[in-house]
Amino acid sequence: MAIPWVEKYRPKTFEEIVNQEEAKYTLASWICAKFKAPREFCTRWAKKKDKEIVEAKAVLLAGPPGIGKTTIVHALAREIKYELIELNASDVRTGERIKQVVGRGLREASLFGYEGKLVLFDEVDGLHVKEDLGGLETIVEIIEIAKVPVIMTANNPYDPKFRPLRDIALVINLKRLSEDDVVEVLRRICANEGAKCEEEALRSIAKSSLGDLRAAINDLQMYLSSGKKILTVDDIKRVGERNPQLSMFEILDRVYRARWFDEARAISFNPSFDWEQYFLWALETIPTVYKDLELMAIAYDRLSKADMFLGRIKKTQEWELLPYALELSLGGISQVKNKPRLPPFIKYGFPQRLLLLAKSKEARRRREALVEYLAQNLHVSKSFVKSELIYVLSAIAKKDHSIIDRLSKALGINALDIKNLLL
Ligand SMILES: Nc1ncnc2c1ncn2[C@@H]1O[C@H](COP(=O)(O)OP(=O)(O)OP(=O)(O)O)[C@@H](O)[C@H]1O
């Protein structure tokens, strides 16, 4: 597989990072004031002497996706010859784990040729503070005692829960890149790839990227895939036309009728593809398409494997597993051995599960309100009400209907609601 251009063209030096001069000056001034760094680098970049910069304990780089936050730290480490110890939100879910990784990184001797170590907590706003057993506190603790530079990045660190990080670190805001900045980088890449790219085409890519250079570079690579050496504005329009909004019926039809694995897999690139919805539809349409039990079993087996990946993603936020789930649920159910010729028209039914959820929405809402009311008034958790109390009350109510009225009076809730819930 071709190397992604976002990696191939990731700037290696401070100089190559486009239009983030202020951020580069501030970051370099902080590093040069507090840590060992090459003289030439400091002379070129460390232009600021503000107290708040030179005394900061750590740095938090903030700004929208794809504008160079991670890149600037990688380039800095290379410029000052520091070894990078990098953690992202999925590594740093628990305080314990953070301490393990950072501690091990700091204890081990640096590889030959490095002057020191630099800790990067990438995308700290990906931390779900409540569930993150101590993640945030541990980062603050590490910053307090660290003798090495600690840098964090975040798309949106302004949520009140990240206040401890903002308080302890110097926040450096990176700018959203302009359309011209993005076009400039794309033009350089075209030249380097030996491709002739129309200015208008590059502008159109830049416009839809909304300043996210990563997205723009990825789009350019897609347009110039399979060795194409010319990019015109018509190519861009054509791809837009090739990717119309599809209904779920059309998506399913394309998946089941795909002739190759890749053809089915590629449907996930359509802008209207919603994998969670698709999954529900796939679950119920397999028997409509495959009448043969053996084929049905194969398709369900693949879908169940995809479901295992999805379960794991939901639990651990390991989003890098999503491609496996998609391959199994698209290519996997489309390409079964000895697939029969499909009839020209297949009637895909609306998933019963969605219908049921829609029908029972009101009942579920009432039940939820009642559970909440019971939990609050009886000073127990909602899960206790759902998992235990309701069964006890229901068993009593089956023998003695008067409990419904008594509960209704005591709690001030309609007797019918209580009856529906318990019986
Ligand atoms: N200012 C920039 N100058 C040059 N290239 C850039 C710049 N910003 C981003 N890029 C390109 O975009 C890619 C993604 O950048 P980077 O990973 O640094 O984004 P980010 O701001 O950290 O985004 P996220 O918050 O999504 O991680 C880089 O590999 C690089 O190719």
Curated annotation (Swiss-Prot):
Organismal lineage: Archaea, Thermoproteota, Thermoprotei, Thermoproteales, Thermoproteaceae
Range of residues in the leader sequence: none
An example Gene Ontology molecular-function term: ATP hydrolysis activity
Classification via Pfam families: AAA (PF00004), RCF1-5-like_lid (PF21960)
Key word Transmembrane helix present: no
Gene designation per UniProt: rfcL
Coiled coil feature spans: none
Keyword vocabulary terms for this entry: ATP-binding, DNA replication, Nucleotide-binding
Record's keyword annotation contains Protein biosynthesis: no
Protein name, entry field: Replication factor C large subunit
Similarity section: Belongs to the activator 1 small subunits family. RfcL subfamily.
SUPFAM superfamilies registered for this protein in UniProt: P-loop containing nucleoside triphosphate hydrolases (SSF52540)
Single GO biological process annotation from the record: DNA replication
Protein residues bound to ATP: G63, P64, P65, G66, I67, G68, K69, T70
Domain of life: Archaea
Role according to the record: Part of the RFC clamp loader complex which loads the PCNA sliding clamp onto DNA.
Subunit description: Heteromultimer composed of small subunits (RfcS) and large subunits (RfcL).
